[in-house]
Amino acid sequence: MKSIDQPLPAQEGRLKRNTAMIVLLLALLLGLQPVTTDLYLPALPALTQGFGASMVQAQLTLTALLLAFGTSQLFWGPLSDKWGRRPILLGGIFVYVISAITCALAPNMEALIAARTLQGVAMGACVMAARAIVRDLYEPTEGARVMSQALSGLGLIACTCVPVGGFLTDWMGWRWALSSLVLFALVTALLIYLYFDESLQQLNPHALQAKSLWASTKKIVSHL
């Protein structure tokens, strides 16, 4: 069992030396957001028609996702401080895969909305942890450089989402478009499992106490 009182310099060193892998992981984790929203958009008219749903219901699949994504990060931060980044990442990406499968197989619009809400919660865990990893491993200047490289990868992912989503929807149907999110998440999960060690040097056993939660909330709100 890892001590909560001792830093973990060996793990930090391995991660720092493998900057290329860290950049790739960051790009994929941050890329979950445009993949989950932009790739989904071309499929929205088809799935709305397929379910015989209203446009209001269709828009709710996006609204619920984004609300869950935003609010869940208030809790994922303290949880990752208490348990570490790796458990939160693995748990988050696992839930994302399950929710993405549920979206692709959804029998009706209500099930899709529920699955998209869960997907937003899972996406919040992954995106929050990605930003925290940079703070764990690098000084501000070096961290900005690493994040800049990751954002370049994110931009590439974002640019391909709408064309890929449109192609899959037109040629294979909206369920296949949503299934591509499962593949993206599985690849990301495999890389996390194989190549990502814990980046947090010291766990915080008090992270879930009311005082710590309030401090974290104020910090997040101040950056909005």
Question: For each predicted feature, which ranges?
Answer:
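Cytosolic juxtamembrane N-terminal segment immediately preceding the first transmembrane helix
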Residues: 1-33
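Juxtamembrane intracellular "pre-TM" segments in multi-pass secondary transporters
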Residues: 9-15, 201-224
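Extracytoplasmic
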Residues: 21-55, 76
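Residue-level signature of mid-helix packing/kink "hotspots" within the transmembrane helices
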Residues: 38, 66-74, 158-159
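Helix-breaking motifs and short loop linkers at transmembrane-helix boundaries and internal kinks
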Residues: 52, 84, 105-111, 122, ...
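Conserved MFS/SLC helix-loop-helix module at the cytosolic interface between two early adjacent transmembrane helices
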Residues: 71-110
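Helix-loop-helix hairpin linking two adjacent transmembrane segments in secondary transporters
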Residues: 107, 111, 148-194
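Cytoplasmic helix-loop-helix junction between adjacent transmembrane helices
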Residues: 115-156
